[in-house]
Swiss-Prot record:
Disulfide bridges in this chain: C4-C87, C173-C178, C216-C225, C242-C266, C243-C291, C259-C264
Physiological role: Catalyzes the hydrolysis of phosphatidylcholine with phospholipase A1 activity. May act as an allergen and induce hemolytic activity.
Top-level enzyme category: hydrolase
Tissue: Expressed by the venom gland.
UniProt-recorded name of the protein: Phospholipase A1
Family: Belongs to the AB hydrolase superfamily. Lipase family.
Entry's EC annotation: 3.1.1.32
Active site (catalytic residues): S134, D162, H227
Family annotation (InterPro entries): AB_hydrolase_fold (IPR029058), Allerg_PlipaseA1 (IPR002334), Lipase (IPR013818), TAG_lipase (IPR000734)
GO cellular component, as recorded: extracellular space
Length: 298
């Protein structure tokens, strides 16, 4: 049998709200035990965060991201923890293939939870946003396809944090995260070795040309560090308005200081309020908080 099986019991929802940060684990069956799910309706926007291969919801970078979202936006965060199906007990890349095949199933699971939120708790699809890292970005895409099959509206937004490249780069839309999976799909590219290179969203941000993130040191850790840096960048962009500004790739010689709201786009939860779409180059500093805007807000 598979070393990293998928079943509904191997995926847990870690529900984090401003009032309750216990990071308790829930399944579809036990959701109703959470205070938030004892109510008739959930009135706050919901964010699903999904991790990648060999990871889990309790990794420090995800906890930082959850905290930033709770503090900056009045949202309710649901983290899909599929560590078993993501093979976090094994490191062999042999298991990557299994984790890849599990992404569609975990996506379907998130779609099922979404339907429950909409039908039982009066949540509007316009208030649901998905954020996924690596394989979790494709999980979010599959969830986006599934909710449409369930005859629900599209999700308002999917944010793909360095979506996994291996096994996905050459796939067509139906087999990976795609811009039709939500009303707005925002992608942050940070690693060519582990991340997808092609543009697959409404906006694709190529931080430091989408590879070798500054401050990530030497190979082989450089690639792993660059790949996970996408999570850190998003966290900083939630904490600090316009922390990272993207310049249209066709005008990459342009300076951040000459950026206007019409042309450039700020990475983060407000990206979709900017008119421009396409591929953007994002220069970046080499130390936290990595912001490139020098205090400028567009």
């Amino acid at each position: 049998g598979s070393k990293c099986p998928f079943s509904d019991d191997t995926v847990a929802m870690v529900i984090v709200t401003r009032e309750n940060r216990n990071r308790d684990f829930y399944t579809l069956q036990t959701l109703r035990n959470h205070d938030e799910f004892k109510k008739k309706a959930i009135t706050r926007p919901v964010v699903f965060i999904t991790h990648g291969f060999t990871s889990s919801a309790t990794v420090e970078s995800f906890v930082d991201l959850q905290t930033a979202i709770l503090e900056x936006x009045x949202x309710k965060v649901t983290v899909s923890d599929w560590r078993v199906a993501a093979c976090n007990r094994t490191t062999g890349l042999l298991y990557y293939v299994t984790a890849v095949s599990n992404t569609r199933l975990v996506g379907r699971y998130i779609a099922t939870v979404t339907k429950k939120l909409v039908t039982d708790y009066n949540v509007s699809m316009a208030d649901i946003r998905l954020i996924g890292h690596s394989l979790g970005a494709h999980v979010s895409g599959f969830a986006g396809k599934e909710v449409q099959k369930l005859k629900l509206e599209k999700y308002s937004e999917i944010i793909g944090l360095d979506p996994a490249g291996p096994s996905f780069e050459s796939n067509d839309c139906a087999e990976r995260l795609c811009k039709t999976d939500a009303h707005y799909v925002q992608i942050i590219h940070t690693s060519k070795k582990f991340g997808i290179e092609k543009s697959i969203g409404h906006v694709d941000f190529y931080v430091n040309q989408g590879n070798n993130q500054p401050g990530c040191g030497i190979i082989p850790l450089k690639d792993v560090c660059s790949h996970s840096r996408a999570i850190t960048y998003m966290t900083e962009c939630i904490k600090r308005e316009c922390c990272l500004i993207g310049i249209p790739q066709s005008k990459s010689s342009k300076s951040i200081s000459s950026c206007t709201r019409q042309e450039c786009v700020c990475v983060g939860l407000k990206a979709k309020s900017y008119p421009n779409t396409g591929s953007f180059y994002v220069p970046v500093e080499s130390t936290a908080p990595f912001c490139n805007n020098k205090g400028k807000i567009i």
